[in-house]
């Protein structure tokens, strides 16, 4: 027996509400694990190291971010290279607190890939987007950990890990994780084509899931999804602090059949799945609450594998950008952004507005 429309709407509303409550409880669990890991990390540092790693929560440094090499974007924080072995393990435990097992493996694999990139560049087998007078130093321990405020299971604080091709940001307000964006992963090379790690594609799922969706589209759908035969040279939002929705948004999910919508959600799952399971569930709950049917998929560039290409996924509240054009189409940049939620700024504004200080 078919339920009345009003009953189905009530059921849908109840489901969204349950997802929201569940994700909030989950976010509190995740923030507690982060607070414990961050406290252990900070307590293991020397006074000088602690000074390098620690910033006021309201410091401008918290919004200072990028994904390019440190030589071209000077960074602050405590460098992994300057940590002893036990401190490095504690830093890794903090990273694990924010990421899933796959996300942690992805982040550390990207860091390790710096060694491969350095060898390729030394042999003249990696194409730079812009020639440099001096080669960049590729360093798998050239990543910085930063703590903003005092880690606590009840208070407001945040943390960041950043270096070439990894930039992860987490913000906790009153003991609840409210933001895990911007979150950036990159890979150069996108595919290792020689040497002991030949065939390695760290961010392969990001490309493969997008191609599966693209290939499922018919000619009419492709005219809406494919924006340009040429891909942009990089992500359009780059490392801006404030971003706005991009136009056009491409083919909306409401214009897809059920199979294609499933492929779209599998693509989104690739990105949410980098985060700890409870953080991923929170992202999923938010985008569903805003309306899956409003999510758009757009592509630019070649459709043949191995060629330069770009895509984006955009909903009412979030944007995913992926670009693979540098190094002759073998260098990926990808990011998840929240239009109002990056760095937790929207909830922080609401918190400051409603709470007396």
Q: Where do the PLM segments sit?
A:
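Bacterial N-terminal signal peptides
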Residues: 10-22
């Amino acid at each position: 027996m078919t339920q009345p429309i009003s009953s189905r709407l009530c059921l849908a509303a109840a489901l969204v509400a349950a997802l929201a409550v569940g994700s909030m409880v989950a976010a509190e669990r995740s923030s507690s694990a982060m607070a414990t890991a961050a406290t252990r990390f900070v307590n293991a540092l020397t006074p000088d190291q602690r000074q390098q790693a620690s910033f006021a929560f309201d410091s401008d440094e918290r919004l200072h971010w990028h994904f390019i090499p440190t030589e071209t974007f000077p960074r602050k924080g405590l460098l992994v290279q300057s940590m002893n072995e036990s401190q490095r393990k504690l830093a890794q435990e903090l990273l694990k607190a924010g990421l899933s097992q796959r996300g942690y493996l992805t982040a550390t694999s990207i860091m390790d890939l710096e060694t491969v990139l350095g060898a390729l560049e030394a042999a003249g087998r990696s194409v730079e987007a812009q020639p440099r007078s001096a080669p960049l130093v590729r360093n798998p321990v050239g990543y910085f950990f930063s703590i903003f405020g005092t880690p606590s299971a009840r208070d407001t604080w945040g943390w960041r890990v950043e270096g070439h091709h990894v930039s992860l940001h987490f913000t906790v307000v009153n003991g609840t994780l409210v933001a895990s964006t911007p979150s950036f992963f990159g890979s150069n090379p996108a595919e290792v084509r020689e040497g002991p790690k030949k065939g390695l594609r760290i961010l392969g799922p990001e490309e493969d899931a997008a191609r599966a969706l693209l290939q499922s589209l018919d000619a009419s759908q492709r005219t809406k999804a494919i924006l340009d035969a040429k891909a942009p040279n990089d992500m359009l939002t780059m490392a801006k602090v404030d971003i706005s929705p991009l136009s056009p948004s491409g083919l909306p999910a409401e214009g897809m059949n059920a199979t294609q919508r499933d492929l779209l959600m599998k693509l989104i799952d690739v990105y949410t799945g980098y985060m700890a399971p409870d953080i991923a569930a929170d992202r999923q709950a938010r985008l569903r609450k805003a309306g899956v049917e409003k999510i758009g998929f757009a592509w630019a560039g070649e459709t043949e594998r191995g060629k330069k290409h770009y895509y984006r996924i955009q909903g009412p509240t979030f944007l995913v950008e992926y670009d693979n054009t540098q190094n002759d189409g073998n260098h990926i940049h990808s990011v998840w952004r929240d239009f109002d939620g990056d760095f937790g700024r929207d909830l922080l504004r609401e918190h400051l507005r409603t709470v007396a200080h």
